[in-house]
Amino acid sequence: MTSLSILLFCSAYLLGSISSAVLICRVFMLPDPRKTGSNNPGATNVLRIGGRLPAALVFIFDVLKGTLPVYVGYLLGMPPITLGLVGIAACLGHIYPLYFNFNGGKGVATAIGAMLPLGWELVSLLLACWLVIVFITGYSSLAAIISVSVAPFITWFVKPAYTAPVTMLCILIIVRHRQNIIRLMSGQESKIWDKGRTKE
């Protein structure tokens, strides 16, 4: 592992640590998403408490947090496993942000952003899967879990060399959703249009 790789890991984590949900809610004078609705600083909760515009801004920024460092590594010719670790570092920053008392989101948008340099085909299929599941069930968390679960299989067909790093990234996201899985199984999970009955 080179010093350049380590520098990119650290940069990805620090970039991921910028909580766009908290900052954008401050700009729009909305409640702190960590203390309102589902208590999750992510685009879905911001949609619940602030509407489409702030939620869209949060989603875009969170995607870029994953895309930028991975794309830099891609341009530098780093191997797939290193790019996977860069993506994981960005997601860890989002999930455990240094600047916000390590209280972050689920990392779904950032993970999507990390996969974006691998090709539009992969990300488009994952977003389509997410939208279909949300439309059918209303559960953002279930849509995220299913989407990242199929991501390694889609990657195998689109960019097989990146299957291992994408799998690592998806495992992290699924582990982060373990409480959501428990609530889904018990019927206590909130839907995307709910005003935050339970944590997201």
Swiss-Prot record:
Listed A to Z, the keywords are:
Cell inner membrane, Cell membrane, Lipid biosynthesis, Lipid metabolism, Membrane, Phospholipid biosynthesis, Phospholipid metabolism, Transferase, Transmembrane, Transmembrane helix
- Say where the protein is mainly found: membrane
The topology of this chain with respect to the membrane is: Multi-pass membrane protein
| Record flagged with keyword Cell membrane | yes
Transmembrane domains' residue ranges = 4-24, 81-103, 116-136, 153-175
GO cellular component term, pick one: plasma membrane
**EC numbers on record:** 2.3.1.275
Which EC class does it fall in? Answer: transferase
Q: Which GO terms describe its molecular function?
A: acyl-phosphate glycerol-3-phosphate acyltransferase activity
Keyword Transferase recorded? yes
Q: Where does it live in the cell?
A: Cell inner membrane
One of the GO BP terms on file: phospholipid biosynthetic process
Q: Under which pathway is this protein filed?
A: Lipid metabolism; phospholipid metabolism
Q: Any idea what job this protein has? A: Catalyzes the transfer of an acyl group from acyl-phosphate (acyl-PO(4)) to glycerol-3-phosphate (G3P) to form lysophosphatidic acid (LPA). This enzyme utilizes acyl-phosphate as fatty acyl donor, but not acyl-CoA or acyl-ACP.
Q: Which family does it belong to?
A: Belongs to the PlsY family.
Assembly behavior: Probably interacts with PlsX.
What name does UniProt use for this protein?
Glycerol-3-phosphate acyltransferase
Record organism = Pseudoalteromonas atlantica (strain T6c / ATCC BAA-1087)
What taxonomic ancestry is recorded? Answer: Bacteria, Pseudomonadati, Pseudomonadota, Gammaproteobacteria, Alteromonadales
Q: Which gene encodes it?
A: plsY
